Amino acid sequence: MRRRFLKQAVIAPLALAGTGNAAASRQGSAPLRLGLTPVFLVQRARLLEQWRGYLGNAIGRPVEFVLRGSYQEITTLLLSGRVDAAWICEYPFVRHDDALRLLAAPIYRGEPNYRAYLIVPRDDDTTDWIEDLSGRLFAFSDPDSLSGYKLPRYWLREGGRDPDAFFARSILTWSHRNSIRAVADRLVDGASVDGYVWDMLERISPEVTARTRVVLRSRPYGFPPIVTPAGLSLRTSHRLREAFLAMADEPDGQLILEALGLDGFAAVEPSLYDDVRAIADVMEA
């Protein structure tokens, strides 16, 4: 049943075009530009090249990855049509879903969901973060991040606290990885991060996560999705969606998924993000 579900269902600006992709050798094929943000630990040239090649062959045209250092930059590129698709945070998606088309969501540990983690240094005695981190130093990742910014501020607001006055000082790290390292190095007393990123960093750099401790794991939220501008042709959107959905059944796709720590991609309904919409309604009021 799980297999059927899968079938149905701070970094410098950079564009990776690469060579060796059969689709890229076709004369006259304009590349499909796919945006990525630092939320994903895919800053490895070999993996990006393999993924680019897989997607290009699957959709029959070359693919470029366009990387930017903030969610807002990628969102702006999407809304202006300067990228054809992107893997974005769910918070920008729900704020602009009238102008975006939802293609697919990653499947992580069997579900299209992830959790936010509230972390502190390993030897910190924090047990109740809302009480114990008051007046201390805190790291936020990106102003448009649900797990790394909006959610902890929402929790404080719902608890009757002023998010702008709760901490003595807060910093923006511009990536969950940077936030985790800031906590590990005791540059800050706590941070709220994407649990998927923490889990992946535990796998590839356990010496970093070992110097942190998870105080709180949030309820599940819809995993950051793959989206396109609403104006992208339906034919291109369909081909791209099918390429993502087929990854779990293709040997090359399986290798990429393993490196990403994902089970696959699935078609999902916009209602997956209703809880995020409710938070956005409160935070943007």
Model region roles, listed by residue range:
Residues 62, 140-158, 242-284:
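Ligand-binding clefts/hinges and TM-proximal coupling segments of bilobed small-molecule sensing domains
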Residues 29, 34-56, 68, 115-180, ...:
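Bilobed "Venus flytrap"/periplasmic-binding protein-like clamshell domains
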Residues 50, 54-86:
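N-terminal, post-signal-peptide region of Sec/Tat-exported proteins
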Residues 72-86, 131, 175-196:
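Short helices/loops that flank or line small-molecule/ion binding pockets
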Residues 3, 76-132, 153:
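Acidic, polar ligand-binding/catalytic clefts
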Residues 87-99, 157-158, 184, 189-209:
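A ligand-binding cleft/hinge motif common to bilobed small-molecule-binding domains
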